[in-house]
Amino acid sequence: MDAKGFKLRPKTLDSKECRRIYLNLIENFVGWAETKFVETDAYEKGGGHFRASGSGVTWARGNSNLCIAYAVLLTAYPERKEFTIHKIPRAQLENHLRRTIRFLCLSYRGKRKPSWRPGWQVSLEFLGAAWAAHLFEKHLDKDTVDLVRKTTCAVADSLKKRIPSRRFGDTGSEDCTWNAPFLAFAANKYADDSRAKKWDELCKKWAFNALSTGNDKKSDSVADGRPLKEWIVSENVHPDLTIENHGMWSVGYQVACQAFAHGELAYRLFGRKPPEAFAHHADDMWRNVTRALYLWDGDILFPTGQDWSWKSYAQSEYLCWQRLSRRQAAAGAFESRAIQMALKRQLAVGTGALGYSNFGNNTTKPNKWAFSYLCHKHIDSPDPVSMEEAYKESLGVYIFPHVKVAVHRAPTKIVSVSWHDKYQPIYILPEGDSTFANPPFFFPYARTSGGVRITSESTGKKQRRAERWSKIQLLEAERTHEGKGTRVRYTRSRKDGITQYVSIASLPDEATVYCTAFQASKDGAYRVESPFHFKAATIQGFPMRTEQHRGKRWLNISDHVGFVSTAVLPAKLPSDRFAAADDRTYQAKAGEWFGALAVVVYTRQPHARTRKMADRVRLLAEDAKKVISLRLESSSGGSTVQFKLPK
């Protein structure tokens, strides 16, 4: 695989180009998958399946994921005799696909190992195989076709169960987004079955409840022939349409409704109009939530910290769905970036994987690529818009009180601040083509990004680790500069009596100001280490070029981002890191603020400009009891920012 030979293109790709990239991604992955196939006579002589279990993925789901990928690849190239750089014969791929489909059917409620049965992932454990059998049906024998029908119908029947209702911490939304598409396929593929109408109705019910709010339960609005309140039996999302999972705002689950593309596709391919249920809150969510999260390289921001794999671009399927089904042309610009970055990374890894995660977890990606390919094949794309236009549409301040996050999208940056009970990362991300076609580095979504380590030395015993912050109090989260900037202030406290004050002021231009101070409930010595620390990183396929320029109070990394501190910086910092001040021990009295510090972060700024700005950033006044005033300069001119300390 040649990563150097693949060049990233800034333009928005058309559907034909997207299909080609999706097929390349799938074919590369299939080369890896072929090393995981195992022979077994567990259910019939000459059977087989893939070793495809992994993090969050059951063995059956992993095999189903591979089935749809194989079927799409084989049907897209009906005349090809060999596949992948390994020149795998077509007959081998067809054989493994057929045997895997049969193994999944025979092992449903099986008495041998491995087996699978109705459970919370049951839809995912067979939807890919069911679709694969449909696409590849003319190459399958009657017995296999009959087995697939029997298993599909049995799984569809198992979905007549209680719809989950979980708004806080562990949403029930994802279950709904998985189950509705399966029922859509069963109802349309087997429309001659006496149960098809019931599956169709149940599909709509699961779909409506995927993005259900409290107000939906009272709504008389008519959708799919009934008042909405008659469909809704749950409350799975917050009033602002944000979604929690894993105890935080895990945005992979925010876009889990990307699976609705599979459901809509089932209706379209069998000549029926998709139900309105798949559109429930979809446009409002894009406009008010999810478009705030997609970055210039097509990746999605994790405001409360990374969940699952970093920079896998797995959420590109949501962009495909928004682009084609919801007609959001801007999503196409982000999709174009995401799938190119995924292919570049895959080529660099060289195995077909996207790195970091295990094989079973990785199988979720070719599943998404396969369905995205099918959508681009069967649904016309809206007229494309450029990335510049798409990004401009998303500019502004987004405040999400239920998940405790504020996001500011400005022309050269995205600033994200979290005051979540567990995680309070601060991200200041440079945006623009330099973060796509020629990125010098990325800032990982570490949950401690922009944080600090502080320990008490009062006991005479050195603490090995700082205690976790246990109480967060939001003081302010508001729009400034006529909606073009934002300010967030909060305090966070610990059980040992230490409180940190944090204030972030994101200006409409390239400048963002961070201010902090500390308070202790007891007299004593307190050690503050690495305040406002950031670390740069990169992914496979993108060599990290970090060139550090610095002075006493300023530092610039690769003419990409500049920092100016009110304190003297550490004498030695690795070229990929920043901290706003040297480690220092303070003698503090109970109730008094200490360690006050401010930093101005400039995005997309040459180092000569950062050096010049350093002379113009200064504290005007510091009253440890009341207020800190900071004077700075940016491309918009001079500004004075005041930080009021809590009483």
Description of each model-found segment:
Residues 630-632, 646:
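Acidic, serine/threonine- and proline-rich intrinsically disordered appendage/tail regions
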Residues 270-277, 295-628, 637-642:
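Extended polysaccharide-engagement surfaces of secreted carbohydrate-active enzymes
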Residues 1-80, 84-109:
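Low-complexity, Ser/Thr/Pro/Gly-enriched N-terminal "stalk/linker" regions
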Residues 74, 78, 137, 191, ...:
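Short coil/turn linking the two alpha-helices of tandem helical-hairpin repeats
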Residues 112-132, 146-403:
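Extracellular polysaccharide-recognition and catalytic grooves
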Residues 36-61, 101-126, 135, 139-141, ...:
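Extended, helix-rich scaffolding/adaptor regions
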Residues 1, 646-647:
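Bacterial/eukaryotic Sec-type N-terminal signal peptides
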